[in-house]
């Protein structure tokens, strides 16, 4: 347990639930076909492993125990990927040491004709299974009894959903089930019709963006869902949404899944002292590379770009929280950034006493007086995802109280922000780095590797047994109290493994640098000028090319980065925190504040709903970024919007399939990496692939 600001975060609250793949819902006939299919595949896999063993023995120069790896003292160059295959290698060596000769092993290999026959049987059995699943589309699916076992239990973190369902932290809970999809036919059946387990009916609930990427979804016991449905949806039913013309189904599922985010209960969330206002949006003039998605033509042009500066960001008074954090409530998500908007209003009143600057209009046209109503939190329209389905903010507040809805928080700024690591994507776009520059960038990592063998403090740091670690486990506590344990054989062996791991990470581009991950926050002073002083294009406190970072107050130039980093997303900006007392007064958190006159959000492709930036102060990286990105401008292209549909089981299934089959982020980013590895990379191809990658992300996260 740890305390951050006004909240206590208990990371140990977890709940055990069942997880089943689609095979766990098969009928007896389908199961028989599946077992036959697995047996055939096992023959193929066993043959592949046997061939690998024979090749390994031949490389050793013979067969039998005397040729096994354990009988030679020859020193070989370590394989940098060996730790990833350690278990497989040990198992293979064990089989190789049984004394069988190469000829004996060859005698067990499948012939070409046998392989052909088995592969033919695999195709036929697979087609028969698919046909049987299609024939059974209209049946009620049941979880097979043998699947309800300890092998199919996972743990999930505490969330609004688990709290509403009053889930146990000690027993296995049967109210939620996570389903892993292998055959779409079975998934279609249970998404549309539900399924039964132990006599109880379960219905499809939703899937988070992360679950969609891994082809998973959550089902819920129907009787339990009916009890908590209004608390989870703040009284907004599918019937009401359909009466308003429907919704983008994937957005709906993503927003419904917000209650399943790992959060800590915000017990005294002041719903009565919260309002929702229109976002702060302006046109920002600048040069962009415009991409036409239909023709892939790229045109550099000067234009006005519409930017929603507060996209996903709201404000909370310092009296309620000293730290920025992310909020979760029914249909509400985003960042709450600390900002004294009450003080802003008072100072505006002093400058112009004839105007009541405390008046602000919400998204429904209702005027509010910040002081008279004691407003402590200002949300923005972009944070209130289903705002159009409520007639007023008062209706949402009333239903919030009526149905016992709750809010949660997550990802609060820590008291101490650890240094971050560079990654290969950020490194590969600095295409002209010299060997000397690379050596400087690797210096911290190399120093750590050297000191791990001799410096006690470095050893403790690597183990996480330092004051900077918030939650020490028993092993770390032991090391902290008695560092002499570092000489223990177990510790020394673990240290060697850690050293190897750090070396492998460094080879893959994960390098220690002077940098930290910070919340991205817009110029909230400019937002208040817009909301309370009614300025269309407020000046704010930051000019184009400027940022504010209290964390790096002494560093006047920063490289602002964000993942995924695919196309030279190095935004080198001037940090003006130290030179401007007004900025120190208003931007008093550990986030990084960006200007409302800057196209930085288009360069880094971020919004402000809790996105973080890797803010780097390394002078070598900054110099290389300035050199490599001198002619880089933001990519700009229209994002397609899916239409609204009625919420039905059919629509839910179609939405899930569209997300599952909508593209593979990894394939695109890997293709981009291959392009950057060329001596003369095709930069235009990278730009187009980045656009396609963002289209895929948009489909996945709705």
What is each residue range found by the language model?
Residues 1-64, 69, 73-75, 79-81, ...:
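Conserved small-residue
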Residues 559-561, 613-616:
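Short hydrophobic-aromatic micro-motifs
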Residues 602-604, 615-630:
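Short active-site loop/helix that positions an aromatic residue
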Residues 628-648:
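Short, conserved aromatic-histidine micro-motifs
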